[in-house]
Amino acid sequence: MFPASTPHPCPHPYPPTAAKAGDGWRFGARGCRPEPPSFLPGYRQLMAAEYFDSYQRAQLMALLSRMGPRPVSSRDAAVQVNPRRDASVQCSLGRRTLQPGRRRASPDARPGSCQPRSPARAGRPPRSWRTVALYSPVTFGGLSSSLEVAGDRQTPTKGEGRPAPTGTREPEPGEVAVMKAVPQPQSEEGDVQAEGQDGQEQPPREDPDSVAAMQSEPGSEEPPPAVEMAQDPSDVAASRDRASPQSTEQDKERLRFQFLEQKYGYYHCKDCNIRWESAYVWCVQGTSKVYFKQFCRVCEKSYNPYRVEDITCQSCKRTRCACPVRLRHVDPKRPHRQDLCGRCKDKRLSCDSTFSFKYII
C-alpha cells in the first residue's frame, strides 16, 4: 500500500493510543507515516526525508513560539517575517532578522556609477526602497532622512516651483516656536528665493525655444530675447502664486515633527466648578497645546487645563532656581509649585510623575 522507503530515523515522541489511531496517522514499528485523507484520494505520500525535515521545522517553530507541550502538526510550519507587517515576530526573534547585506543599494551609491547624472535626473528626490522597522539597526538614514524624503516628494521637479533645498534638516527645539510665531516672513523669504531661482532657471528653460526659433529663422536673432523679456512678468507672478502654497506646505511638513516640553497646568472642571493645580503637562514647545488630559475626580469627564505656564521659579523666573534664599518646599533641581497639590502625596500616580514621551510625529 505504501511505497518502499528507508526506516524513519526518529520514532514519534508521543505513544500511540487507540483514540488517535483513526485520526489519519498510522503508527508502526518503522516510525509514523501519514495516511492519505479520505477527501484527497490522489494525495502524494510524504517521504521519510521530507517528513523528517517538516518535523524538525515544526519542532523549531514550537520552540520559537514557546508553545505548550502539545503535539505540533508536522504537515507544514512557517512564519512570515516581513518588515512591513510582522514587527512583533521580529521583536521576538531579535534584531538578526534584518541583515545589512540584504538591503538593496541605491544606484547612486554604487562604486561603478561615477558618471555625472543628466539634468533631467538631477532634480529627482531620493528613493526610499522599503519600509524598515525603526527598532532595526538597518534603517534608511534614520528618522530625519525619512522626513526629508517625505518633504521632497511633495516638491515638483519639472519647473513648477522652487526645487527642494539641499540642506533639509529636522527643526531644532526652538524653531517650532519661531515658525509658529512668525510664519509670514518665512513665506516672503521663500517667495524671494523662489523668484531668484526661477530667474536663474528661466534661461535654460527658454533655450529650446530660442534654438528652435534660430533654426527656423536664421536671419532674425533679436526677437527671442524680446519675447523672453515679455514673458518674464507673467512667469514671475505665476512662480509667486506657485511658491506661496509650496512654502506653506513645507511649513506644515516641518510642523509635523513637534517637540514636547513640560509645563505647569491649572486644571478646572466647569461642570463641578472644581479647580486644582496638578503640576506637569506635556505641551508643544512654544505653544499651550496640551497632549495630556485628566479626568475630574467627581464627574469623570475629560477636560484640558485652561491655563498653562512654564515651569520656572516664581522669584527668579528661571528653570533652575538661582535665588540666594530658597524656600523649603522648592526643589533646587525642579523648582515647581510643589506645595499646591497635597492629595497626591505618597501615591503611585502623583504630580511628580513624568512621562517618557519626547516627541510626537
Swiss-Prot record:
Residue stretches of biased makeup (Low complexity): 116-128
Pfam family, one: Zn_ribbon_3CxxC
Subcellular location: Cytoplasm, Cytoplasmic ribonucleoprotein granule; Cytoplasm
Disulfide feature: none
Residue ranges with Basic and acidic residues bias: 238-252
Modified residues (Phosphothreonine): T155
Annotated region described as Disordered, given as residue ranges: 68-129, 142-252
Maturation and modification: Phosphorylation by CDK1 does not regulate formation of MARDO (mitochondria-associated ribonucleoprotein domain) membraneless compartment. Ubiquitinated and degradaded by the proteasome during oocyte meiotic maturation, leading to MARDO (mitochondria-associated ribonucleoprotein domain) membraneless compartment dissolution.
SMART domains registered for this protein in UniProt: zf-3CxxC (SM01328)
GO biological process: membraneless organelle assembly; mRNA stabilization; negative regulation of translation; oocyte maturation; translation
GO CC terms: cytoplasm; cytoplasmic ribonucleoprotein granule; intracellular membraneless organelle
Zinc finger (3CxxC-type): 263-346
Entry keyword set: Cytoplasm, Developmental protein, Differentiation, Metal-binding, Oogenesis, Phosphoprotein, RNA-binding, Ubl conjugation, Zinc, Zinc-finger
Keyword Zinc: yes
InterPro entries: Zar1, ZAR1/RTP1-5-like_Znf-3CxxC
Keyword Iron recorded: no
UniProt GO molecular function: molecular condensate scaffold activity; mRNA 3'-UTR binding; RNA sequestering activity; zinc ion binding
Subunit-level organization: Interacts with YBX2.
Membership in a protein family: Belongs to the ZAR1 family.
PANTHER family cross-referenced by the UniProt entry: ZYGOTE ARREST PROTEIN 1, ZYGOTE ARREST PROTEIN 1-LIKE ISOFORM X1
Comment on protein domains: Disordered region at the N-terminus undergoes liquid-liquid phase separation (LLPS) for the formation of MARDO (mitochondria-associated ribonucleoprotein domain), a membraneless compartment that stores maternal mRNAs in oocytes.
Protein's job: mRNA-binding protein that mediates formation of MARDO (mitochondria-associated ribonucleoprotein domain), a membraneless compartment that stores maternal mRNAs in oocytes. MARDO assembly around mitochondria is directed by an increase in mitochondrial membrane potential during oocyte growth. Promotes formation of MARDO phase-separated membraneless compartment by undergoing liquid-liquid phase separation upon binding to maternal mRNAs. Binds to the 3'-UTR of maternal mRNAs. Maternal mRNAs stored in the MARDO are translationally repressed.
Protein name: Zygote arrest protein 1
Gene expressing this chain: Zar1
